[in-house]
Amino acid sequence: MRRKINSFFAILLCFSVAFCATGCMSHGENNGTGGSQSYTSGIGFSESESDTAKPIDKATDKSTSTNKSTSKSTNKSTDKSTDKSTDKSTEETETPLTLKVASYNIFHAEKAGYDLSKIAKNITDNGIDIVGFQEVDHFTRRNGNVNQMAKLASLAGYPGTGRWFYPAIDHDGGQYGLGIMSRYPILKHDYIKLSSGTAEQRILAHAEIDVNGTIVHFFVTHLSYDGEGGGSSRAKQFNEIATKLSGYDNFILTGDFNTRDLTEYKVISNSAMVNAKGAVTYPDGNSPLDNIVYSTKAWTFGEPTIVTKSYSDHYMIFAQGTYIKK
């Protein structure tokens, strides 16, 4: 009988313990709202960014670490792949450098009635990037003491850092010579005197131009004509020009060569000419006097365009070149 009673009390005791445990847990869920918030915050689901960033336990930390490692690996791999793909795509789609360059003998604007706006319009209408001028006046009386290069640059909307005048001779109270005008800044400029004998002094002008990080060596000249013993003088002048250009792989030469013999320029090594085969630039019907010569190591050029309404005794010639030097 005592055993049965003991067994009964043992069963009753177990039942009471179980009931108490269940009641306590239930009571905590219903009334312990503060404890619930603490739990939620602990696993990183609160709106606080700092709380969210914290791992809750080792297991979670390991998992997070693994995810981070996987993410880094994936990102690194993806970044490399993307970089390679981007680099390759950039190489394939990179736009080559192109320039429209012109040679323009403006006859000191006399044919334009000394109205430089007409000459400037020719340049802007054709989208010229760099132009080499011949027969430019600089503060001469006949031109009303005007700085023609500064005036042309202003009318055409070219920057003040992109134009320069190069004096060949003193004339009419001022100077007369060559000019270079560029949409891009001229970093350096110089010129050399060419052998001219007793005739009018001739020069070769040079500008070092920064075209979006690529240095272009741009030259302009105006050589002797036959009436002043130009044949023998020009041969010397071309040789002197060739010597000067030999120091540059990346050059463009513009000018009025005053000769119909288009082979004379060939003393300039690694070069080619735009304006071959009868492109008339002087209005007597057969005189291709104005030319563009370029380094074949750095450039290719398309066919030239001749602008017949040039307000001068010469037509403006221009062509587009593509930079190929790596």
Positions of predicted regions on the chain:
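Long, intrinsically disordered low-complexity tandem-repeat segments
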Residues: 54-90
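Serine residues within intrinsically disordered or low-complexity segments
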Residues: 36, 41, 48-50, 63-65, ...
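C-terminal motif of bacterial Sec signal peptides marking the signal peptidase cleavage site
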Residues: 20-23
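Active-site regions of metal-assisted phosphoester/phosphodiester hydrolases
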Residues: 25-45, 54, 89-126, 154, ...
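Hydrophobic helical h-region of N-terminal Sec-dependent signal peptides
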Residues: 10-18
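Bacterial N-terminal signal peptides that target proteins for export
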Residues: 1-10
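Proline-aspartate-enriched helix->loop->beta-strand connector
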Residues: 123, 127-136
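Active-site neighborhood of divalent metal-dependent phosphoester/pyrophosphate hydrolases
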Residues: 106-109, 133-144
